[in-house]
Every structure is written in structure tokens, then in C-alpha cells.
Amino acid sequence: MKIITPSYDFIDRDNLMSPEKKIETVGRLCYKSEDKITDTSAEPFVRGLISRQHHAMLEHATLILGASEQAYKDIRFLCDEYEDEIQLPSFIRHTWCPQTRRHVLSANIRAWRNLVKFSTSLFSKFFFPEGFEGFLHAYPILFGDLAPVSTHVRYGQVYQLTPSDLISPKEKLAHHPLTVKFTVDIAVARELCRHRLASHAGSSTRYCDYANGKFGSEITVIAPEESIDEQFVRAARYAEEKYMAQRSEGKTPEIARSCLTLSTMCEHVMTATLGQWKAIFDLRALDSTGKAHPQMKEVMLPLYQECVQTMPDVFGEV
């Protein structure tokens, strides 16, 4: 049995990964198959996720569009009039910035796919402004399985933006994504999932076989925030023994996991906009609504402090 301290790491903080590679990076963490990542592995992995309709992983990649007034109205019309049919329209975020005099729209890949899929089935044509067809064709792995796109050209126009193109704090808060991998225990990971506007992924105890050599045939637990005492060690070792006994009897990992302790290590990935992170820090690092759990604060406070240091224009006023 290993005992480690909790920690966090950024995933693609500088937004240099392609959407496909970022989806693969997060997705493989769930199955602990990061060793299979190569320069060409993203395409078959992402296509496999889509074919199996494992769309949750698509939420960790964000695409941002600049839009003219007419283009924004067209997209808004679809979201407002057909909210129930499209699903996830609230995940398509919008800002109008007087400084840049532009509309900005952003969403994760799952939300964009829902919008495209519904539009093509409803209108037979893709009822979107000029520029959107090229945007979709630029990502054939992500959108190529949907109905053939025939763009209904209107007066509006859209163009793709990157996070570095976001100028004002308002745009950054609404559209800039930040993905963080937390190495915490199962209890803290469960608390993180309560932030429902964020997207989540985590190492799965259904598929991670701790009796396998990949894990050293042992479990890893997170040390308590205060101190490690004999009772904690004994309880964790007992859980490990019972888990291994279940596996040796032929029980699958998804059944044997019922023996695991809440202190078992979990790698949990969380993607949210900077605005959402700001609200999360307010609750989990700064105790705005009461004292945060010590083990949650143990990772959230240093993460918040690093974000303040690197992005003071966004986080300096939390």
C-alpha cells in the first residue's frame, strides 16, 4: 500500500493541444491507459468514444467562435426555440463586448455536436451563417459522423477564436477553459462532482484493476490533511487485503471496489471556464459560505493562489 499527499496539475494550460488530443488525454486517464498515447492515437480513440456514444469525454475540449450580429441571432434562435430538442443549449455561452464590438460564442464539443445534429435533422440543411461549414470541416474526427452539412448561407458570419484571442476580462471569464487534474481521495472527488456546470472525468474503479501489475498489485491512499495515525493505516491495509481477496476469488474490479476505502486515490479531471473556477474558488478555497473541507482546501487554496499569480486580471478580485 502506498500513502501519498494530494496534488493538482494543469492539463494543456496554454491551450496548445488539438481538441482531439485533449479529449484523448482526459479519456485515457479514466481507464489508466495513458501509456497507449502516441502521435497518431487520438483519432481512433476519439472515433471510438463517439461510436460508443461516450460523449462525456467530448466536454473537455472547447471551441470558441466570433460572430456577427446576424450570426448570433441565427444561433440564438435555434437555442431559444428548440431548447428541449437540442439539449445542452445552456452550455453554449455568449458575450457581447463593447471593447471588441463582437459576439463571442463558446461551447464544448458535445454541445456543438448536439446543435449540429439537431439542425441538420430539422431543416435538412444546416441553418447557420457563412463560415460555419468550414469550421465543421476543419474537425472531421469530431463532426464527420453527423449528417452531411449543407450550409444555408445568411448575412451573418462566424470565425474561430482561440483563448488567447479573448481580450476583456468579461470574455475570459465566460469562454476561457481551464482543465485541472486533481490527485485526491474518492471522497474529495465526489465533492468536486457537485460543481455541475463543470465537466468531469476520473480514474474508474470499475476498470482500474489494482491487483494488476500496472498498479503494483497494491492500492494507493491519500494521507489525511492533519496526520497519519495507526488507525488510518490499519483501516487502509484492511481494505486493501479484502479487495485483493475478492480479486483472487475471481470477482471483477467493479465488484471488488466495494471493499475500497474512501481514502483511495482518485485522479479527477475538471474542466470549467475561468468564471466557473472563480465561483468554485470562492466556495472551496476562500470559505465564502462556511468552512471548506480541509482536504478540499488543501488542493484548492494553492490552485487559487497560482491562478491569482498567473491571471491577476481575472482572479485578482475573487
Task: Mark where each language-model region is.
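Family-specific signature for flavin-dependent thymidylate synthase
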Residues: 1-318
